[in-house]
């Protein structure tokens, strides 16, 4: 049922490929509805983190309430929920979409549809949202709005004839976009008197208020003093404040079915208010939670160690602080013979890992070493037990392994047709299995591959961009596990295994990879007073070796002429000394060596 009040509410989000102008459009909508004064307008209002502004990407979901007055005098409340566009934050997108009834699909008039446009669009369709296409950047000379409209109809299959043509940069036709939202996005429904049901679509920690949950009320009413229960954890809290975003907090008396806002209830830890969870009343609970909750599952693991061992506690505190705001980050302590004490951290993907590392270095001033990222392998041992392996050093010996499986992703790559050969070549080099290809228009092709996740976590994206001059776009999702013939590649320095450099590789590539790494390390590790052999080994078998020559003092400098036996005695003595040194000496491995492992080119 729909109340009179709900008829004037529209909840929508904006989805787009990276750089198609999503955050800029959000700025224009905020400006056009007069939500912020000129003085408060800051470019990309909703991207709060410096990192977000610098990289030009949206990382956390944000929300803002706009009041739009139509020419007829009616006032509409538009709740805009800004979502991240990057594939790593896919699950943030899906929860933000679950809080809406409609989505604006922003498509760049010069580039047309890209891989993430499709991925996010399908996510929106999965959530039964009404999709409103908006074509952006029409002020650019290379814009081709008519062709892009046709493309939207052909590829996605949604009506794009009346799509507003806007320029978010100059503010052209923004009113058309607002009208389209009011006309096309359905109004919310939901009984205001029913038991409370509210979806948490984002939560983060505020040092004064505790955890602030961004919520969309689906049914019922929530106000200060209500006793609430989180359906997933079963914990009960009392509401301290409810309010709306204009983009800053503005407390209100109550939020009713259909509203989007925030609630604080002195919750101490973001883990207790997990994104996707349902809030209900403690006394009058809803029968079942809202669907679509799934905990964030890390896909990529990496070890993070402080460069200075004494900073271990600081690193732990920093990770805990980041985790308060980022429920997708997981970490547990681990030790490495080479690097000392540190943490094994789990991330959603590479961008997520990159951002966490950068935030540790920036916001907490920590010097850290990160090890090569790895994925979760499933191993069935000969005695029938199943283990999940996230750290290559813990891999059981080959005689104990009956079966080893690795995660496989379904990836779609959209590329200009000139580069199809180069892209196919890259995918095959990365053990990709070709599934199908379709032409989106005369110039662009969508290729679908199944590729092992471990092949794309290093530098697949960079390689793809360089082979297509930056034109290809890429999107992936995990589809399951497949058996694989994998071995553990160890690196030995001076006959000692350096555990932090171990990695899991396909058997047929072990030799090439080992040789490559040995050469790379030879260039990076500085010469010492004694000779250092660098060896790559699979099991007990050495497959590659390089030697770093020792630095030598010229012990013959003081012999002018003289007998050969005198010289030989001095050289033998030097050799003995070097030999003794080598037995007790340890090798310092610079941070670059750990990074080099990741960047070995095939």
UniProtKB/Swiss-Prot annotation:
Catalytic reactions on record: GTP + H2O = GDP + phosphate + H(+)
**Which residue range or ranges hold the tr-type G domain?**
7-189
Decide whether keyword Protein biosynthesis is in the record.
yes
Q: What class of enzyme is it?
A: hydrolase
Give a GO cellular-component term. plasma membrane
MF (Gene Ontology): GTP binding; GTPase activity; ribosome binding; translation elongation factor activity
Instruction: Name the keywords, alphabetized.
Output: Cell membrane, GTP-binding, Hydrolase, Membrane, Nucleotide-binding, Protein biosynthesis
Q: Where in the cell is it found?
A: Cell membrane
Please name the Gene3D superfamilies in this protein's record.
Answer: 3.30.70.240, Elongation factor 4, C-terminal domain (3.30.70.2570), Elongation Factor G (Translational Gtpase), domain 3 (3.30.70.870), P-loop containing nucleotide triphosphate hydrolases (3.40.50.300), Translation factors (2.40.30.10)
The keyword Magnesium appears for this protein: no
Q: Which Pfam families match?
A: EFG_C, GTP_EFTU, GTP_EFTU_D2, LepA_C
* E.C. number(s) listed in UniProt: 3.6.5.n1
Membrane-topology annotation of the record: Peripheral membrane protein
Disulfide cysteine pairs (residue numbers): none
SMART domains in the record? EFG_C
Q: Which residues bind GTP?
A: 19-24, 136-139
NCBIfam families named among the record's database cross-references: lepA, small_GTP
Q: Which family does it belong to?
A: Belongs to the TRAFAC class translation factor GTPase superfamily. Classic translation factor GTPase family. LepA subfamily.
Reported function: Required for accurate and efficient protein synthesis under certain stress conditions. May act as a fidelity factor of the translation reaction, by catalyzing a one-codon backward translocation of tRNAs on improperly translocated ribosomes. Back-translocation proceeds from a post-translocation (POST) complex to a pre-translocation (PRE) complex, thus giving elongation factor G a second chance to translocate the tRNAs correctly. Binds to ribosomes in a GTP-dependent manner.
Which PANTHER family does the UniProt entry name for this protein?
A: TRANSLATION FACTOR GUF1 HOMOLOG, CHLOROPLASTIC, TRANSLATION FACTOR GUF1-RELATED
Matching entries from HAMAP family are given as: LepA (MF_00071)
Q: What is this protein called?
A: Elongation factor 4
Q: What organism does the record attribute this protein to?
A: Clostridium botulinum (strain 657 / Type Ba4)
């Amino acid at each position: 049922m729909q109340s009179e009040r709900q008829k004037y509410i529209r909840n929508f989000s904006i989805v787009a490929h990276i750089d198609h102008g999503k955050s800029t459009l959000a700025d224009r909508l905020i400006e056009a509805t007069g939500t912020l004064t000129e003085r408060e307008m800051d470019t990309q209002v909703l991207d709060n983190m410096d990192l977000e502004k610098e990289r030009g990407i949206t990382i956390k979901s944000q929300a803002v309430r706009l009041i739009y007055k139509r020419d007829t005098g009616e006032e509409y409340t538009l709740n805009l929920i800004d979502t991240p566009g990057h594939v790593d934050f896919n699950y943030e997108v899906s929860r933000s979409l679950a809080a809406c009834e409609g989505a604006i699909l922003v498509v760049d008039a010069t580039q047309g549809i890209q891989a993430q446009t499709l991925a996010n669009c399908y996510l929106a369709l999965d959530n039964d949202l009404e999709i409103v296409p908006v074509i952006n950047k029409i002020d650019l000379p290379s814009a081709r709005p008519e062709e892009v409209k046709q493309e939207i109809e052909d590829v996605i299959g949604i009506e794009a004839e009346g799509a507003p043509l806007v320029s978010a940069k100059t503010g052209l036709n923004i009113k058309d976009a607002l009208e389209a939202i009011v006309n096309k996005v359905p109004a919310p429904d939901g009984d205001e008197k029913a038991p409370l049901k509210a979806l948490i679509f984002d939560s983060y920690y505020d040092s004064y208020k505790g955890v602030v949950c961004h919520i969309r009320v689906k049914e019922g009413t929530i106000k200060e003093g209500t006793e609430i229960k989180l359906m997933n954890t079963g914990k009960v809290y009392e509401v301290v404040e409810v309010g709306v975003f204009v983009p800053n907090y503005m407390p209100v008396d109550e939020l009713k079915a259909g509203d989007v806002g925030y609630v604080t209830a002195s919750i101490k830890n973001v883990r207790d208010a997990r994104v996707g969870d349902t809030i209900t009343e403690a006394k009058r609970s809803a029968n079942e939670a809202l669907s679509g909750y799934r905990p964030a599952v890390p896909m990529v693991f990496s070890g993070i160690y402080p460069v200075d061992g004494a900073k271990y506690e600081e690193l732990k505190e920093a990770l805990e602080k980041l985790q308060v705001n980022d429920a997708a980050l997981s970490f547990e302590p681990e030790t490495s013979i080479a690097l000392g004490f540190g943490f094994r951290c789990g991330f959603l993907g590479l961008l997520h890992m990159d951002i966490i590392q950068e935030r540790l270095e920036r916001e907490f001033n920590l010097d850290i070493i990160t090890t090569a990222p790895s994925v979760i392998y499933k191993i069935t041992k000969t005695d029938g037990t199943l283990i999940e392996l996230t750290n290559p050093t813990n891999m059981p010996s080959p005689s104990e392994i009956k079966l080893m499986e690795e995660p496989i992703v379904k990836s779609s790559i959209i590329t200009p047709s000139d580069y199809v050969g180069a892209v196919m070549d890259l995918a095959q080099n990365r053990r990709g299995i070709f599934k199908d290809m379709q032409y989106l228009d005369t110039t662009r092709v969508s290729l679908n591959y199944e590729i092992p996740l471990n092949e794309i976590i290093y530098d697949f994206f960079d390689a793809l961009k360089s082979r297509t001059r930056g034109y290809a776009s890429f999107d992936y999702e995990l589809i399951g596990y497949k058996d694989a013939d994998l071995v553990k590649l160890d690196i030995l320095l001076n006959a000692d295994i350096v555990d932090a450099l171990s990695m899991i590789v396909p058997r047929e590539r072990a030799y090439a990879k080992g040789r490559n790494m040995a050469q790379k390390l030879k260039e990076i590790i500085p010469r010492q007073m004694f000779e250092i052999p660098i060896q790559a080994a699979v099991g007990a078998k050495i497959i590659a070796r390089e030697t770093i020559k020792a630095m030598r003092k010229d012990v013959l400098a003081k012999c002018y002429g003289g007998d050969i036996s005198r010289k030989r005695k001095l050289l033998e003595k030097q050799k003995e000394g070097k030999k003794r040194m080598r037995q007790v000496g340890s090798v310092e491995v610079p941070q670059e060596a750990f990074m080099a492992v990741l960047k070995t080119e095939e």
